[in-house]
Amino acid sequence: MVDYELRGGQVDCVLRRCVVADGKVWQLQMTAPLAGSDLPEDRMTPRERELCRDDMNHDFLSGVFNRRYYETEFCTKLDEWTDRHRCAALALVSIDDAAALSARENDAVMGQLVCFVANQWKKHFDQPAERVVCRLSDTLFAIGCADRTRRELEEELKAIYAGMPKECVASVGLMRRVPFTQSIGVAGTREVRCKNWDALYDLCQKRLVAAQAAGGDRVYDGE
């Protein structure tokens, strides 16, 4: 994630990234000063500003929305939906055994796999005001959807996942097929007292972990 911060009259470009190594998640931050005391957006035309913000809201690898968009743009829509008495649902999607895959495959192959998975979901969730897919971390995605209960989104995701390829053709080096599966946890606003994405996320995460513990390759559909 790239951001800009004003510190003591100096504009800094801040790059933040999470790196998984040895089973731990490390948060890296790099800062570099920019010339002048104005934020880059202040120097742009309206069109340049729009393009810049759009670029900052998308994952550089897969092209789907990123965590920044999820946290600053899409999550705020929940308040609008609940104010209008509209329900919403959230799903967390994870590639199974990602650590083992990363250990077995090189970065280029993993990048192709992530892009493949992202684009499979993007086919069905690419309406920024209502249905979106976001890449939250290396192999974790969030799918947000308005006007769906938990069960309705579960059934939709089951149907989509059932027809989704479970092999990615890796074109790095010798062309070959890389098999993979996914686990999915879903929650809806009607299930949580605090109708916000944090509460939904926590419930989704519990169900995602349960799906993985049950062997993966499934949409969690327990109680």
Regions found by a protein language model. Name each.
Residues 57, 66-89, 96-123, 134-138, ...:
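Conserved long alpha-helical elements within nucleotide-processing catalytic cores of c-di-GMP signaling
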Residues 22-60, 65-79, 129-131:
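Signal-transducing coiled-coil linker helices
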Residues 1-26:
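Per-ARNT-Sim (PAS) sensory domains and their PAS-associated C-terminal
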Residues 15-22, 31-35, 147, 186-188:
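PAS-family sensory domains and close relatives that share small-molecule sensor folds
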Residues 25-32, 90, 140, 185:
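Short hydrophobic beta-strand segments that form the core of ligand-binding sensory/regulatory domains
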